[in-house]
A protein has these predicted regions:
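Intrinsically disordered, low-complexity N-terminal tails
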Residues: 113-115
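Long, low-complexity, Lys/Arg-enriched
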Residues: 1-110, 122-212
């Protein structure tokens, strides 16, 4: 997987790291109208830089999105095999790690997995979770007879990877509690409260801590 006729270093050569705040990585497929969900997520997250991750087949769609992003730095990237989960996952990690090297914190990297193959979306999601990215989103809505989201009905569904980490920690805290390891349980419950603001998860952590 590589950038379009350039390297990551060349793409970012004249971009001032000190001004960077948020980056958005979008999977790009070949369907009709797929540019709208991508542009919607750009409007929502207001990133300084957008990575359009697609395939050779979706190059035309990528160019269509680029044409509408005049004031945003855009980097093009291509999956070598959009149906190979292992390769897509490794290439997704590479995108995130390159952004990290260029000054972005993982928590300031967001992903839109609406378009592209299911494998591409899954790979980007797994990469986002493994690196603790800010959040990843999916643009849903009412669909027409061809299965495409009808313009004007879009709604953005988001999930923060930190919520997944918090749920895992909460499960471990319960395990420690059941084994009378109260000190370890208390530490994990405190970490859970620092990871997420999800009311249900926080309340469970506080309850376990209270009876600990």
């Amino acid at each position: 997987m590589g950038l379009d006729n350039t390297s990551w270093k060349e793409s970012f050569k004249y971009f001032e790291v000190k001004k960077m705040k948020k980056a958005l990585v979008c999977s790009v497929g070949v369907g009709s109208g797929i540019e709208r969900p991508i542009l919607l997520s750009i409007e929502i997250y207001s990133p300084e830089l957008v990575v359009l991750a697609g395939t050779v087949a979706s190059r035309e769609k990528i160019e269509e999105v680029c044409a509408k992003c005049d004031e945003i730095e855009v980097v093009k990237s291509f999956f070598s095999n959009p149906d190979d989960l292992t390769k897509c996952y490794k290439e997704s990690l590479k995108i995130l790690e390159e952004l990290k090297e260029r000054g972005y914190n993982y928590k300031d990297i967001y992903l839109n997995i609406t378009s592209g193959t299911k494998v591409m979306s899954a790979a980007l999601s797994l990469a986002a979770v493994s690196r603790g990215c800010g959040s990843f989103c999916y643009v849903a809505g009412e669909r027409d007879e061809n299965g495409r989201v009808i313009s004007g009905t879009e709604r953005t569904l988001t999930l923060k990877p930190t919520t997944i980490f918090a749920e895992r920690m909460l499960s471990e805290a319960k395990s420690y509690f059941d084994r009378y390891l109260y000190g370890a349980c208390e530490v994990l419950c405190s970490e859970v409260r620092g990871l997420t603001e999800e009311k249900e998860i926080v309340e469970k952590a506080e309850f376990i801590n209270k009876i600990n």
